[in-house]
Amino acid sequence: MRCGSLCRFLWLWSCLSYIEAVPIQRVQDDTKTLIKTIITRINDISPPQGVCSRPRVAGLDFIPRVQSVRTLSGMDQILATYQQILTSLQSRSVVQIANDLANLRALLRLLASAKSCPVPRARGSDTIKGLGNVLRASVHSAEVVALSRLKAALQDMLRQLDRNPGC
């Protein structure tokens, strides 16, 4: 009886010994590739006719300005805000980008856990309050501003990932 248990344990051990963890470098490379894909998608979306990429529309302060984020949790927070904004836009052209942001956030969490960082938790953004009123007034301008600022933030994140960001 004990020999049977020992044999099952050894068989299970041999199976588990072949399972390898995903190398952290591969996750980081996948993260960079997804960022580049999102930037390409943003470039493929042309702004609507007559909308400047830097409009002077009041009320778009809820869209984060470009700032260098040096931590994985900071990157996750920025992406959570943009994901919420893009989802609120209800535009067919940004649905895939919003989904890509969710996948990118999952990859950043995986990077954070591989570095033994606490899991980044996106806080509820108070800056998104009243988003519906602004979007009703200037949905196209909000989309253009959000995408241009998201693109700049993603380019900064790409640079930061090369520098091995902290928690």
UniProtKB/Swiss-Prot annotation:
Disulfide bonds: 117-167
GO molecular function: hormone activity; peptide hormone receptor binding
Pfam family, one: Leptin
Signal peptide (from-to): 1-21
One Gene Ontology term, aspect cellular component: extracellular space
Lineage: superkingdom: Eukaryota
Transmembrane residue ranges: none
Coiled-coil parts of chain: none
Main function: Key player in the regulation of energy balance and body weight control. Once released into the circulation, has central and peripheral effects by binding LEPR, found in many tissues, which results in the activation of several major signaling pathways. In the hypothalamus, acts as an appetite-regulating factor that induces a decrease in food intake and an increase in energy consumption by inducing anorexinogenic factors and suppressing orexigenic neuropeptides, also regulates bone mass and secretion of hypothalamo-pituitary-adrenal hormones.
Protein name, as recorded: Leptin
Gene name as annotated: LEP
